[in-house]
Design a protein with these regions (language model features):
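N- or domain-start disorder-to-order transition segments that initiate the globular core
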Residues: 2-54
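M16/MPP (pitrilysin/insulinase) zinc-metallopeptidase core fold and M16-derived inactive scaffolds
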Residues: 51-133
Length: 135
């Protein structure tokens, strides 16, 4: 059975997306996927949802991090961000996730103008747990 992107878009439009405004919805033919762009009403954050029949679930959060000088501060912040939190008070949750997770991808990357934190897993529970650590 093939993925029906048009049907999926209609389902997603009807779903409860409280706190978000639907900006755009379209069929992504090349990817056999349904695509949505949402805007979080309170923060203005843009959320992109791509839905298809792939078992691998992917999440990424990214921030503009333009450099002010050549000290590498953005890269230092990238690493500091993954050094534990009140909710996850371990020295290096990233290492713990690498050891005990079913992830298919787990990383953080600093580019010249942005920093991204992507994760992926085929296991629903693991995926939600990883997202919780990253958020």
């Amino acid at each position: 059975m093939s993925f029906d992107a048009v049907k999926k878009i209609e389902e997603l439009k009807k779903s409860d997306i409280t706190g978000y405004e639907l900006v755009k919805a379209e069929v992504l033919k090349d990817m056999n996927s349904a695509g949505l762009i949402l805007r979080h009403k309170k923060s203005g954050a843009r959320v992109v949802v791509i839905s298809n029949d792939d078992n691998n679930k992917v999440f990424s959060i990214g921030f503009k991090t333009p450099p002010f000088d050549d000290t590498g501060m953005q890269h230092i912040i990238e690493h500091s961000t993954l050094c534990g939190s009140r909710k996850y008070p371990v020295k290096d949750p990233f290492v713990e996730l690498c050891k005990g997770s079913l992830n298919t991808f787990l990383n953080a990357m600093t580019y010249p103008d942005k920093t991204v934190y992507p994760v992926a897993s085929c296991n629903d529970t693991d995926f939600k747990n990883i997202m919780d650590v990253y958020m």
